[in-house]
Amino acid sequence: MVLGSTNIPWTLDGNIINTFQKKLYISLPECDARKKMIELNLKDITHTLSDQQIEYLAQNTKDFSGSDIYSLVQDAAYEPIRKYMNYEYFKKIPGTNGNQWNYIPCEQNDEGAIKMKMTEIPDSKSILLPKVDFDDFKKTLERTRPTMKEQDLTNFEKFTLEFGKEIK
């Protein structure tokens, strides 16, 4: 058995196309599948998203591939770090997760404020990052676009009508 895969099947030579008995088109994930993908990608990320917020994300990621959804979740997971990179003052608080101390951002006039950038904190594991929240996702969603273009989808549909079978 020979299995082949391509994201541009319409560019293949006719002889190669005819070599394969079955040509299957696996379409982009629908809303329920996108929701499951988001939930799966969130499983190791500390977050505050509700089921309704995850549903909102699933509904607003039409035309996103599985890879696009993975990138969206990973990008949103970095938002708290991006926020912390802008702070100029941190203070120590009693530690969690086995750390003697944790560092959190603060204002210059806060008691215990130490002038330093996040990159200057002695032990990066002692930085207490906030949980990823819905605002982080909304911000990320604003700048993230699906990688699949409308013309590509049209080409897939034409190829599937002529040669293959669609799997949803």
Residue ranges and their predicted role:
Residues 1-3, 10, 59, 64-70, ...:
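C-terminal engagement/docking regions of AAA+ P-loop ATPases
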